[in-house]
A protein has these predicted regions:
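Extracellular beta-strand ligand-recognition surfaces/modules
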Residues: 1-21, 198
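Acidic-and-aromatic substrate-binding clefts and catalytic sites of carbohydrate-active enzymes
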Residues: 29, 55-70, 95, 125-132, ...
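Boundary/entry segment of secreted carbohydrate-active catalytic domains
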Residues: 31-89
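Short, acidic/polar
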Residues: 60-78, 187-193, 276-287, 314, ...
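Active-site neighborhood of glycoside hydrolase catalytic domains
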Residues: 36-46, 232-294, 313-333, 337, ...
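Substrate-binding cleft and catalytic face of glycoside hydrolase catalytic domains
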Residues: 79, 83-267, 271-273, 324-326, ...
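Extracellular beta-strand elements of beta-rich domains used
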Residues: 4, 19-23, 84, 212, ...
Length: 405
């Protein structure tokens, strides 16, 4: 069976029409590969990286639909990876209901649901959190012996604009005092919910989620933010954002309350990291200026070879992050190439992976004991990638490995 999916920019509710569709076979096709016969990525790197992961979707849509509910995909993930990251279903936009599905509940009702309402929260209502996909994914992890990266708590994109307004009404921007309380409510509630769910499923909090992306892409905060967003409330604090530091502190305190601060790592995550490495290091140093609450740096690594970045620049960036002594993880790896050639992509991806492996094996363990603890490939195959030009290890599906695999 085949599913053809169309979408247009803008409102997901807009109607549109197709005049005609023509499907043309341009080649005679390739032999179908049984994915069960392929070598395992996680086994290949098991003595180098603790985690080898992919991103996936529990519900999803189009080519991404039901990835964690289909037997063939589940078996593929179990064989190839030991970690998953939800691509979108744990981002604030989804958890808060997006721009159109906001639901407010009373503080009393929220407390009955286990939400953490801080003393400085003075509003009568809070947003009801949609954690269905998160819970289902945790259940998937428990059933299939797979761990999870939690992505993400704070981002200037994919967070509904009404979250930053008075009374959640989508109009006037809220005050910093109001947002401080909302931030604390959201961060503490998210961590507590996940840890409670872990305990329910496995008997132990901290047993499934090993890393949280607390803040995503702050260095690129001016890049297409939701309007309004964090900067509209707090202003531009450059590389000393008080509210980002607070988010890490809230999250760290929740880990401390469960004795998990040494088992679960809080990450700062960003893209184009090889062009802003010094800023990222400065930001993380600020976050940790009072106490080491940020334990890791996430390198998204959305690459375009051979020049963005060059292998040498990528290696230099790894050196800078490893020198901080913090854990480093490659969190969203995909690699296009300017030529759009499969062999060129394979060569570039090979060089990137060889660089990551070399840096991990040859690091100064007295400076960075753990080093690079994980690599996550951002997607299962090209047709479900957010990027257009052959960025992943498989082409049309899990039975279609590319030379880069």
């Amino acid at each position: 069976d085949y599913l053809i999916y169309f979408e247009i920019p803008g409102s997901a509710k807009a109607d549109f029409y197709l005049d005609s569709v023509v499907i043309t076979q341009v080649s005679k096709g390739k032999d179908v590969i049984d994915p069960n016969t392929l070598a395992s990525i996680k086994d290949t790197y098991k003595n180098i990286f603790q985690y080898m992961g992919t991103c996936a979707n529990y519900y999803g849509y189009g080519a991404k639909k039901d990835q964690l509910r289909k037997d063939d995909t589940i078996n593929f993930i179990k064989k190839q990876f030991n970690s998953i990251t939800l691509e979108n279903e744990m981002k604030p936009d989804t958890v808060l209901g997006g721009f159109y599905n906001k639901k407010l509940i009373s503080v009393d009702e929220a407390k009955k649901l286990g939400y953490i309402i801080p003393d400085n929260y003075k509003e009568d209502e809070v947003p009801q959190l949609d954690l269905g996909a998160v819970d289902a994914t945790l259940e998937f992890c428990a059933e299939n012996n797979v761990k999870m990266r939690a992505h993400t708590l704070m981002w200037h994109q994919q967070t509904p604009s009404w979250f930053f307004t008075e009374d959640y009404n989508g109009k006037n921007v809220a005050t910093t005092e109001v947002m401080d309380a909302r931030l604390e409510f959201f961060v503490r509630t998210m961590l507590n919910h996940v840890m409670d769910k872990e305990k329910e499923l496995t008997g132990k909090a901290g047993s499934l989620v090993y890393a949280w992306d607390v803040t995503n892409e702050y260095v690129h905060r001016a890049n297409e933010p939701t309007s309004p967003s964090w900067m509209d409330v707090y202003g531009d604090m450059d590389l000393e954002p008080v509210y980002v530091k607070k988010a890490f502190t809230f999250a760290y305190e929740e880990l401390e309350n469960r004795g998990l601060q040494d088992q679960v790592t809080l990450f700062y995550n960003d893209y184009d990291e090889y062009n802003c490495a010094d800023k990222i290091v400065e930001l993380v140093n600020y976050i940790n200026s009072d106490k080491k609450v940020c334990g890791g740096i996430g390198m998204q690594s959305h690459l375009t070879g051979p020049e963005n970045p060059t292998i040498d620049l990528y290696a230099e960036t790894l050196d800078k992050f490893l020198a901080t002594g913090l854990e480093v993880q490659v969190t969203e790896l995909d690699a296009e190439v300017e030529s759009n050639d499969l062999e060129d992509q394979a060569a570039y991806m090979k060089s990137i992976m060889e660089t990551i492996v070399t840096k991990q094996l040859n690091r100064d363990k007295t400076v960075n004991p753990k080093g690079i603890t994980g690599v996550t490939i951002w997607g299962l195959y090209d047709t479900c990638s957010w990027r257009k030009n052959i960025p992943l290890l498989f082409a049309s599906g899990i039975n279609d490995p590319k030379p880069s695999f």
